[in-house]
From Swiss-Prot:
Protein name stated in the entry: Holliday junction branch migration complex subunit RuvB
Subcellular location: Cytoplasm
Gene name, Swiss-Prot/TrEMBL: ruvB
Residues that bind ATP: L20, R21, G62, K65, T66, T67, E128, D129, F130, R171, Y181, R218
Assigned EC number: 3.6.4.-
Molecular function terms from GO: ATP binding; ATP hydrolysis activity; four-way junction DNA binding; four-way junction helicase activity
SMART domains cross-referenced by the UniProt entry: AAA (SM00382)
Catalytic reaction annotation: ATP + H2O = ADP + phosphate + H(+)
Matching InterPro entries: AAA+_ATPase (IPR003593), AAA_lid_4 (IPR041445), DNA_helicase_Holl-junc_RuvB (IPR004605), P-loop_NTPase (IPR027417), RuvB-like_N (IPR008824), RuvB_C (IPR008823), WH-like_DNA-bd_sf (IPR036388), WH_DNA-bd_sf (IPR036390)
Quaternary structure and interacting proteins, as annotated: Homohexamer. Forms an RuvA(8)-RuvB(12)-Holliday junction (HJ) complex. HJ DNA is sandwiched between 2 RuvA tetramers; dsDNA enters through RuvA and exits via RuvB. An RuvB hexamer assembles on each DNA strand where it exits the tetramer. Each RuvB hexamer is contacted by two RuvA subunits (via domain III) on 2 adjacent RuvB subunits; this complex drives branch migration. In the full resolvosome a probable DNA-RuvA(4)-RuvB(12)-RuvC(2) complex forms which resolves the HJ.
Region (Head domain (RuvB-H)): 255-332
Residues binding Mg(2+), per UniProt: T66
Primary location: cytoplasm
Length: 332
């Protein structure tokens, strides 16, 4: 069974997110710092009748990077062509995409950190000077062809900005760090989703659901759907704070937004390693999860909420982690 708090896409969620997707910056809830900067850059580019500078959006999964890319294209009034790093396997795949762009278009590459180096190198001249040089043929009969491209905007999205090469990162003129959502913003998102799907929800229930959604809209919308099921079967169809708490408790989502995997990580650190420090590889083996999964999916939220600290010697469980799980804490 999939983890209810997984911030990667599940099942029909891509369709759901498209339904919920705002069209313009004024409709986009949260990420105010990124929005305010983009508003200025977009308006300036439109006034000069130029393509917007290339944009890099980075941050944990589920925070709206793809949505922001679509909003940028809508604000510019241009087409958006979407692909992802793993899909572009060779330089020829990228050349075909670039050759299909119209002036001012947005090319959105999700998981851009997963582009093969041979593909990435083609992007350098395309991003900087809007041209590519491609080789036609093989052996002695091969020749180089210079292909001019129309001005375009590349929007790259990544959950692992540190994996981008320096030459690629340097070619993005605009960077936006997508952060976990504030409680008030996430509450508003829950209420907006409920309204779109004609669910009856109290403000208190929306607030509680937002509190336990790890600052992530994708998780909040997923939990809202599950709580609605509980409200229909165990209540009168109205999503109130009582049914919300009962549903989320049954789903093993506690009041800090931690599920059984998060708690397993913390309990392992406390019970087996006296709170740490413990290496990420060792910890991953003990909880039977891939190292990358722990690092990308679980650890960022646990650090952001103050349950774990990173040190040079490894990960350390904080006093807050001990208190949350009911362990006695003593200074080392």
């Amino acid at each position: 069974m999939s983890r209810i708090l997984d911030n990667e896409m599940m099942g029909d969620e891509e369709l759901v997110e498209r339904t919920l997707r705002p069209q313009y910056l004024r409709e986009y809830i949260g990420q105010d710092k990124v929005k305010d900067q983009l508003q200025i850059f977009i308006e300036a580019a439109k006034m000069r009748d130029e393509a917007l500078d290339h944009v890099l959006l980075f941050g944990p999964p589920g925070l709206g990077k793809t949505t922001m890319a679509f909003v940028i294209a809508n604000e510019l009034g241009v087409n958006l062509k979407q692909t992802s790093g793993p899909v572009i396997e060779k330089a020829g795949d990228l050349v075909a995409i670039l050759n299909d762009l119209e002036p001012g278009d947005v090319l959105f590459i999700d998981e851009i950190h997963r582009l093969p180096m041979s593909v990435e190198e083609v992007l350098y001249s395309a991003m900087e000077d809007f041209y590519i040089d491609i080789m036609i043929g093989a052996g002695e009969g091969s020749r180089s062809v210079h292909l001019e491209l129309p001005p375009f905007t590349l929007i790259g999205a990544t959950t692992r900005a540190g994996m981008l090469s320096n030459p690629l990162r340097a070619r993005f003129g605009i960077t936006g760090h997508m952060e976990y959502y504030a409680h008030a913003d996430l509450t508003e998102i829950v209420e907006r989703t409920a309204d779109i799907f004609e669910m009856e929800i109290t403000h208190e229930a929306a607030s509680e659901l937002a509190l336990r959604s790890r600052g992530t809209p994708r998780i909040a919308n997923r939990l809202l759907k599950r709580v609605r099921d509980f409200a229909q079967i165990m209540g009168n169809g109205v999503i109130d704070d009582v049914i919300t708490d009962k549903a989320l408790t049954m789903l093993d989502v506690d009041h800090e937004g931690l599920d059984y995997v998060d708690q397993k990580i913390l309990r392992t650190m406390i019970e087996m390693y006296s709170g740490g420090p413990v290496g990420l590889g060792t910890l991953s083996v003990n909880i039977a999860e891939e190292r990358e999964t722990v690092e990308d999916m679980y650890e960022p939220y646990l650090i952001q909420k103050g349950f774990i600290m990173r040190t040079r010697s490894g990960r350390v469980a904080t006093a807050k982690a001990y208190e949350h799980l009911g362990y006695e804490y003593s200074e080392k």
